[in-house]
Amino acid sequence: MPDSITNGGRPPAPPSSVSSTTASTTGNFGTRRRLVNRIKKVDELHPAQENPTMGSHWLSEQERSRLEAVQQDWRRTRPMKFQWTSKKRPDDPTTSSPSTVSISNALENSTPSLNNVSSITNSSSPFSLSSAATSTASAIIPFTSNVATNHPHLNHHVSRIPQAIVTGGTNGSLPPLLISPTSAAAATPLISGKAGPMSPSTGSPINVAATVLQNAVSSPQHSIFDRSRLNKIPPNTSLASSSSPSDAANNDKPIQQRHSILSNVRTLTQAMVNDGPRTLTGDDMDKMVSEEERARKEQEKREEEEKAARRIDVEDDFDAQEKPIDKSKNGRFLKFDEELGRGSFKTVFRGLDTETGVAVAWCELQESKLNKTERQRFREEAEMLKDLQHPNIVRFYDYWESADLCGKRKYIVLVTELMTSGTLKMYLKRFKRINIKVLKSWCRQILKGLSFLHTRNPPVIHRDLKCDNIFITGTTGSVKIGDLGLATLKNKSFAKSVIGTPEFMAPEMYEEMYDESVDVYAFGMCLLEMVTGEYPYSECMNPATIYRKVISGVKPECFSRIPAQYPEIREIIDRCIRVRREERSTVKQLLVDDFFTPEDLIGIRVEIKNRDADLNDLNVEIQMQLRVYDEKKRKQYRFKENEGLQFAFDIENDSPDEVVQQMIEQQHIPDEDTRMITKLIKDKVDAFRRDRDHRLLEIKRAKEEEERIREEAEIKEELRLRAEAKEKEKERLEKERLEKKAAAAAAANPNPTPIPPTPATPHSSAQQQPIPPPLSTQTSAEIQQSAQQPSVPVTMIANIPAMSPTSAQPQPVLSPTSAAVPVPTTMIHVPKPSEIPVQNVATTAAPVAANNVPPSPAPFKTEDIQTPTLAQNTVPRTISTDASGLVINTPASIASPSPAPSATDVASTTAPVTPAPTPTTTTDGGAAAASTTTENKEEKRKSNKRKVVMEILGCDESRNFALVSCRLDTSHKSVTFQFAPGTDKPCTIATKLLAEDCLLKVHVHIVEAQLGEVIQLINSDGKKGVGTKLATVLDPNSTEPPTITAVMPKDSSAATASNTKPKIEIEKTPPTRDASQEPNNVQVTNVRKVSQESNAESVQSIPRPGGIIVMSPTNQTDSAPPPTGAAAKPSRFQVTKSADPIATPISSSISTATVIPIVAATPTNITSEPVIVQPITAQVITHLATPSPVSHSLSSNSSPSATTHSNMSSIQSTTSVPGRRFTVQPVSQAESGISSSISTPHPEPTPAITSCPPPVPSVPPVVSNGTLNLEVAPKQTPSATNQNVDTQHSSSTASTATLVSETPATVHVTPISVPAPVQEPLVIDHHSDVLTQLDSELRKCFQVSGVSHSASPSTVVESLTSMTPQTIPLACQTVPASIGQAPAVIAAAHAASLIPNASVPQSPSRLDAETGLAGLHEKLEALKMEQDRREDMGDDAIGTTTTDGKDEIPIDTLKGLAEALGKVIHADGRETTPMPPDHPDLTDASTQQLISPSNPDVLTTMSSAVEGSASSTMIEDIDASTSAVDASMMNSMPPGAQNSTDQIPAAMTLSMDQECAQSMTSSITRNTTGTKLATFENLETALSSTLGTHIRQPNAPSSRDETTAPMTPSFTNERIGGGGGGGATSFSIGTPPSHSPFPVSECDYDLKGQMDLESEDPEVIQMIVRHRMEQHKLLEKQRVEIERLRSKIRVPRATSVNPEMIGDDEADTTLTALQSALGNASLSLPASPPPNTEIPDNEGQHHCNSFRCIGDPNDNVSIVNQIKQRLGIIPSSRQSVRSATSSSPSTPPSSSSAPPKSLSSPTKSYVSHCSLSIGYGSTASSEQQQREPSPSATTSSFLSDPATGVIENV
């Protein structure tokens, strides 16, 4: 057989001589490539139609390729004469015949020898052709390049020779092989003769046969298993048959022609092999060229015809695909022969729903592995799945069971919705990152689909949710969950690896016990894959590894690669993939999560402030914030875009419905959003509860795991020690046996030789290991006895002369130490004998008592010795000696304490043993040194042991709960404390003791264990447990847990010990954060500590009791028990900056207690000397703004709700009226630091004041967006009176009030235009009871806590005006250098009335609005005093409006006063007002040197008088204070200042503007932020109107976008008498006008000062008018309500006014200056009253603004004037006015001095009104307008009437 056949059809390698000629055969590859492309196109356009019985639709790709390979191998072994190889071709037999015949003839006629060879081609055997072809391997056919180039068809036929020989090639197919022609560019001319064709490149002959055979082997082979080529095969790619030419001619003429050509070629090649190469003649070549051209044209024509036929076939195939191949039983669904997908469990075909015309998915499932039961279960579940219709669930239409045509194979058909856009997995591969909005949308839809499944009855569990089963519709973006039926089948049908995808399977799925939570777990893994783009657990190599990680709770590695900017996604995934299914979130809970809630759908969010901190604590109260994102909805709310409504919520007691109802009542939210906000709060609280429970469970579980590990380690250690002890015991017995044997031998031998010592056994490890207590009762010799010490009797078993082997002289075994130390103790801990080697006993024994004793070789006398043990028990021991050493045996049982040894023994004391290194001479020196070191270690261990003893002193069961008194004795200190065993936990008590520095950290666990025992004893029998002592010895060197030893009392006398012992009282409170965790902050001294929240350095996870009152042993007083009254629920809402981390409680909502008022001594010179107004200095503000370490830690680490509960309350509120719990705060403001709007134009060095006591903790930082201008006079009188203060921490503010020191000071205070942080109210001692009662009643009314960490700025003034620099903390002494240069005269009390009250809710500051009533008595007193002063001056006009009395509220009682204030102080929404810009300092030196009174006692009088308003004795203080202020202020003014009233307001204004930012510089550095003044205008206006002080002089613009024009010196001339340059001012005492003369909206500042309203829009004007009407209504209502109050307090006015101290002229001048200074106050109006559409005309307004004559005795004359008139001491008020107006150097000519008329004249009436240019304001009289110096109608100023001296406001 030829080599080509034996080699598998591969031809032999061509000869080396012609191997290089094959490179020229690559020219025809282009034609072959085109043919291959045509065949591929045929495959694509017309796929093979397979037999239905053996179709490939049920085979996978791998199986199909394997089948084809088998078929090819089979066909390769079959003969070629088959019908499928000789089918008719659609070729025209007439087209190719001439060319092929002519070429054949040309080849046959070329040489006569070809005929001899041509017979080979007629052979019917296929091998004959092979042999012939093989023999021509070396034949060379002479072709020219032209023939090869111009006749590719001939070359193609020639190239097929080897393919016909090898019977179909390697795989039975015929590739299009070509002989590569030579290049046309390098073509060579014909060479006649014997020269064969030459290669153009090498010049060597071309081996055609070798090239043909090589192409046949190396060309790509194509599969013949393609029916498209069986029916229609191109002529150039048809199979070459090996049949004879005669058969081919009968069947297929084109094939016959082809074979004839090939036969001729083979004959020619054979001839060339035999005869050698020869060249073709010219005629032969011409014929060949012409035939080839004709054949090529005919081939092109056939190709065109084939293309047209293919197009027709494609159309026919498409029609065939639309023909259904199967249908459902009911005929509704059709199946088409179009496979869409294939999986391990199903095959999906395209289907059609004939009812709807929608394409569906026809899924065929294998049923062979389902048993009968599982089929039945699937039928039931499939029926249920048919009813599931949801937009996010792939629709399940129908199912049935079917069989194939033969009926052998059964399968289940599922018809579902067809999803053509792809799966989520495909999208994740296509897009590396998904947009967060898209991710939210997809997750939301997935959760909706799962929620629909889980809410069915029964719930439907998907079981196989993963990204491959989630389908996405690309056109709409909708997501649907699919493969529900498959998940149902996969439940229990297959192996566990097939139940689901291991990466997405929950741990319980492996145990086949699961519920809907497995879908939540799978969703978490899907979300993880969507976020990270990584497959979960891709790091695992097999399902077993995944299983181990899943069940152990190890998260995938990609979990750590979640983007850091999405912490909420990490939290959601963590909640979904928890190991315990009960800890996972449900689908419903995930749907309500904020992350999946679209903002455009709801527009409102509820957030929890400091959520992480609250999760770790047990606070029942959390701070929540409501924010509005929808701009349309925001218009209905009372806060702005960057603000949120913050409120406190008690998760145990509060109800979302109640909280939302309070919001509606306080007009924070509209009614239509009630249900939505209620649901948001409820969902948020439920999620918080669930997360907190999980967090606590995790902490508990971690502790349990640690405890379990520790116990296991202890058990292992104990077992190991026991094993070692057993070994040692065996060694000891062996040694004893040897010793006895040696002793017997020594006794038998009287003159023994020295016996060498026994080799030491390894014992180093035993010496280091502690022995358990049961095994530590045996001891070895630790007491080294001298050989001649007679005081310790020793019984010797054997007397052995102990001689050292290295010494020539004999030495005793027990040699004395060189420096023995006496041991004055009997308490010795003796370890086991086996711990010390026998031969080293003598050297390791401790010295007992000896001096240097000479050694004695004589034998020892054996005696007995008794050694007391640790428990002072005497245990007899027997000491036996031999040459090896000394052994002491001790009985295991310890007897009761025995008498001490005899007098000759060692003296017994309680001092511990103090071992010293004792060099000894023994038989083994190295062992002796090691033994000495061991001895020292043992003694050190003994000295390091400490004992913790707790004794139960008593149990008081008289209360509702038992109260146990205990005493704890430690090495640190002894302390006595009380606790309630029923409610207090040991860990809580121990933590409190540690916080109070009563306990060391190392003793915490011991004390907790002892307290647990105490609680058990008390619970079992409280009386019998009294007197029990629990002792625990703490050995730091031991790994064993300490053991508690209980000693029961012999009598019950110890039960009364608690009455004489100091104690720490731990009182139970609701679970809240413990703030007293710093031992350094609390000292056990004579200071009484009540605060439970003075500090909070870290978040605690356990509940703690309230406060621990630590008393020294000398202080025997008991603390008051906690109040039992019902706690009131105060106001909780506050609008806050929602972006701020609320560190300090913004609203002390739910606060149940108040701080006991701080009492200071009252000076005795209140009315005996001029009352001086205390300065409101920047030092004071600095002090208030400086956060204490306590408050700072509270604000940074503690929850805002942690400080809302107080254990010690001075008020027992029983009312439950809904108060103010909501506050509005900005969302973008920083936690601390002043507002960015505050600037510091004059940065100068700030001098420090050194006369200050040590700093006292103050309030936390507050926000202030306004300006505060406080100026100090150059002079101050430092005369301080030190007072003892009972310092008490506040649970709301964690701050300590400052001592009020009555120190006179000469200062001037400018109008305060910004609220400042405030301290607790300052209370005077002799009115403390009345003040406490009033404070309690007011707080009951308004539901506020007793202390405010952000009270109103007016409280700041009062609390600060009583402070001298001596009382300011050192940390608060940084003040601007400019302070004290430009002061202005103002009464501090009245300044307090100008500052708005903090009770206004919508303050954008960090002030706690609801606690703004702290210090309310100072405000009321200041307002009342100003009212009295105005009445004294007689410059108020009585309003014409009368009172009907229907709203009268009596205020002669505290309840009435509180009710009246409740009418005034209400929840009003306000918008903020920016600060006025800074202005240059235009004042001169003379103006800046104004001096104010020098006595600060006025505030003390004011504070005490107002709180005792119910008492008639306080009227004297009020009048005295008023007169003193008037007199002292006027007396302290320089002459220039008294004659220059116009300079006073200018000085005040300019100095305030100049020093505004500088006065706040220090507060900026202390993380304080200003509060915008305008937000407090509501309460100020209300209170001022109520008490008759209608003063309102704004100077700040209300618009955020507009600024105030800089003040110029021209304003100084315009503000005569206190007029403000930017706004009009009206003074009205008594009955207010029917129409308010004040600006009623923030825009009025701009309207009156800078804008011309004639060009304003009608909407703006309408809003202004509406605001004015609202103000008018409010003022009228307040006036009616308060009129009764005045009548109640007129009669009890005291007559103790000192006429000498009252200067009416000075007081009037002071009032004028005060009125001028008040023009700088930026105040606003309430927004809560309903709008009033009635707009009175100018005439009505003029009438309402007309006031009767000032000082008319018949019409509502002021109270003070009546009293003073009766006393005959009232001066003429016009003198002060005249002195204030006529002496001004800058007064206009119209206001020159003139004799004033009587102020009480009824004929004179001056209208005080506001002059505006908008047509609806009050119209000034022509006379007033003529005198008006203002250049414009919008500029107002104060003028003095030269005729009357009455100040008018134009």
From Swiss-Prot:
Residues 284-309, 727-742, 1062-1071 have a biased composition (Basic and acidic residues). GO terms for cellular component: cytoplasm. ATP binds at residues 344, 416-419, 466. The keyword rRNA processing does not apply. SMART domains: S_TKc. It is found in: Cytoplasm. Changing residue 497 to A: No defect in the formation of the excretory canal. It catalyses: L-seryl-[protein] + ATP = O-phospho-L-seryl-[protein] + ADP + H(+); L-threonyl-[protein] + ATP = O-phospho-L-threonyl-[protein] + ADP + H(+). Changing residue 346 to M: No catalytic activity. Arrest at L2 larval stage and abnormal formation of the excretory canal. It is an enzyme of class 2 (transferase). InterPro entries: CCTL2_WNK (IPR056865), Kinase-like_dom_sf (IPR011009), Kinase_OSR1/WNK_CCT (IPR024678), Prot_kinase_dom (IPR000719), Ser/Thr_kinase_AS (IPR008271), WNK_Ser-Thr_kinase (IPR050588). One of its GO terms (molecular function) is ATP binding. Transmembrane segments: none annotated. It comes from the Eukaryota. Disruption phenotype: RNAi-mediated knockdown causes impaired survival and slower volume recovery upon hypertonic stress. Activated in response to hyperosmotic stress: cell shrinkage promotes formation of a membraneless compartment that concentrates wnk-1 with its downstrem substrates. Residues 334-596 form the Protein kinase domain. GO terms for biological process: cell volume homeostasis; cellular hyperosmotic response; hyperosmotic response; intracellular signal transduction; membraneless organelle assembly; monoatomic ion homeostasis; multicellular organismal-level water homeostasis; negative regulation of sodium ion transport. Pfam families: CCTL2_WNK (PF24889), OSR1_C (PF12202), Pkinase (PF00069). The keyword NADP does not apply. Keywords: ATP-binding, Coiled coil, Cytoplasm, Developmental protein, Kinase, Nucleotide-binding, Serine/threonine-protein kinase, Transferase. Expressed in pharynx, nervous system, hypodermis, spermatheca, excretory cell and canal and body wall muscles. Interacts with gck-3 (via C-terminus). Serine/threonine-protein kinase component of the WNK3-SPAK/OSR1 kinase cascade, which plays an important role in the regulation of electrolyte homeostasis and regulatory volume increase in response to hyperosmotic stress. Wnk-1 mediates regulatory volume increase in response to hyperosmotic stress by acting as a molecular crowding sensor, which senses cell shrinkage and mediates formation of a membraneless compartment by undergoing liquid-liquid phase separation. The membraneless compartment concentrates wnk-1 with its substrates. Phosphorylates gck-3. Belongs to the protein kinase superfamily. Ser/Thr protein kinase family. WNK subfamily. This is Serine/threonine-protein kinase WNK. It comes from Caenorhabditis elegans. The gene is wnk-1.
